[in-house]
Amino acid sequence: MLLIKKINLQFFASKKGVGSTKNGRDSNPKYLGAKKSDGEFAKSGQIIYRQRGTKIYPGKNVGLGRDHTLFAKIDGIVKFTKFGDNKTKVSVIAK
């Protein structure tokens, strides 16, 4: 009588399977905000405030770029003032 034994062999993974993730990346910094403070001297063309949308409005002698950046049109002193319903505008006063 011939007896054949069946061997039950189970192989396990030698390396763990690696799943994918949807995290692990970040956007580059945009460096938004005030570049010149109230009372500071600004030359013509210098950036006063970088923003997304009109958080701060342009006043006298201040230009508004197409990305809503505020810049000085003339040499002078930067002046931030409140107006209307909790809004802020920035002007440049000639020195």
Curated annotation (Swiss-Prot):
Pfam families associated with the record? Ribosomal_L27 (PF01016)
What is the protein's given name?
Answer: Large ribosomal subunit protein bL27
Organism superkingdom: Bacteria
- Membrane-traversing stretches: none
**Which GO biological process entries does UniProt record here?**
translation
Per the record, the similarity remark reads: Belongs to the bacterial ribosomal protein bL27 family.
Q: Which SUPFAM superfamilies match?
A: Ribosomal L27 protein-like (SSF110324)
Propeptide residues, chain positions: 1-12
Cellular-component GO terms for this entry: cytosolic large ribosomal subunit
PTM entry text? The N-terminus is cleaved by ribosomal processing cysteine protease Prp.
Q: Which organism is it from?
A: Malacoplasma penetrans (strain HF-2) (Mycoplasma penetrans)
Keywords, ordered alphabetically: Ribonucleoprotein, Ribosomal protein
Cite the PROSITE patterns for this sequence: RIBOSOMAL_L27
Tell me the segments the record calls region Disordered. 17-37
InterPro entries registered for this protein in UniProt = Ribosomal_bL27 (IPR001684), Ribosomal_bL27_CS (IPR018261)
Q: GO MF annotations for this entry? A: structural constituent of ribosome
